[in-house]
Amino acid sequence: MKKVSKVLILTLAAITMLASCKKQSSEKKILEFKFASPAVEAVITESAKTIVAVVPFGTDVTALVPIITVSNKATVTPASGVPVNFTNPVTFTVTAEDGSQVNYVATITVDQNGGGGGGTGDPTTWSGNISANTTWPDLGLDVDYIIDGWTYIEGNALLTIEPGVTIMFTGTNGHIDVGENAGIKMVGTAEKPIRLVNPLNNNNPGAWRGITIHSNRNDNQFEYVEFINGGSDENAVVACEGKLSMKHCLINGSSGNGVELYYTGVFTAFENNTIKNVNYPLWINELDKLSVLGNGNSYLNNANNMIVIDDYYLDEQKTATISNQGIPYYVINNGINVCENSKMIVNAGVEFVFDYEAEFIISEDSRLEVNGTASQPVIFRAKNAEDPWRGILFWSNRTTGNLINYAKIMNCGTGDYASERTCLWIGSEAKLTLTNNVFGPSNYNGVGIDDISNWGNVTHSGNTFTGCAEGNVLIWNYGEYNGQTYEEGQILNDLP
């Protein structure tokens, strides 16, 4: 009986130790803060840990009920759904699963006259083109301006929209089109955002079209702008073929995508934005443009919550730095080719999702630097596990800088050639450092080595394999390395 008791005690101790060793989440963000009555969504500035909302004139702020969304496994105090007195700023404490905490200060103000309520009179209706510099001030109305149809800003005209303005569109053809030499400046504030909204009789995504920018003017700025229910006919709410700075903006609702950046488009800044309830939040048509995606962006409740990469070539002499935006990057069509003399740097926590039979090619004299960590590995996977991609084909012979560290390369193995059937194919003259990676599952092999005689150019440690159906390592060509002879087609359990 004593022996049984000892075994039981040891078993319970082991279970307790395993449970205590499990790493707990440290995520502790407020992702969304809104009220159902009145229907107001607050602006969250993550860098400052502030929450700001303006409620309509006459609102009783002594018992407002916030609806709060926080990070997975985190809690918030005061809790979501509980009445709170917002007469003065209120501190909300978010506690992560691991017990760490962060405070946000919520300031709720009542709009006394402007920015959506309090004024009298009729809104100004606009239809047609804008051909001279024009400013739309806040008229202090629930709706200050109504745009009927398609508005084209032409010539060298600049449309400036001031803080607190609300613009309503009359229907699905409602659109602002900024010409090649024109500009648009919408800079609101946290307390007085600029709002572009749907007509009263259509409170659905896609109720109006959006804004398209063709010009490269530095005036093109969106700050604290709310785009509500745009994106008609599956268009993006914001489409940029020119230059745009976009900060602290909200896109809520679209029958299409949130933001599309075309080949000629450039973000001068993209940070602290929230895109929600759209198809894809971001659609990017040039790989190097991904470098500008900044901090503090949130992507919530989207039908396909991924950033689309619709570009095969990272052109010569260009650099793409891929940051962790909290959602995957979806590589459509054929995949990615990092061309000669170009460079891709992938930060910790990034996840790439590839279409069926897509590939990731690292060309000669290009550079790939994958900087995963133990807690935030970089993931390369297929969109659907049953539809494999062709893996990473690594040909770069650069003498320094090529690194894949803490990556998981999985769901690989399809195509007619051996180089397309591995998670990582290492070309004959490739120079590369591989550390702490996981290769597999793969329908064929985890790693393929083209020329074993040049294996001295590869440094490796801490790599593992899982689920490689035809063996972990494939030696493609006969050769010798480190005094040992390898046969063509030989399978190894580990890297030599």
Q: For each predicted feature, which ranges?
A:
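Sec-dependent bacterial lipoprotein signal peptides
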Residues: 1-20
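Detector for intrinsically disordered, low-structure N-terminal pre-sequences
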Residues: 3-6, 54, 60, 161
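Residues embedded in well-ordered secondary-structure elements
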Residues: 10, 55, 81-83, 95, ...
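Small side chains
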Residues: 13-14, 53, 294, 460
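Short stretches within intrinsically disordered, low-complexity N-terminal or propeptide regions
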Residues: 15-16, 76, 98, 108, ...
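Beta-rich interaction/scaffold domains
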Residues: 21-120
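Beta-strand/loop edge motif enriched in small/polar residues
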Residues: 114-496
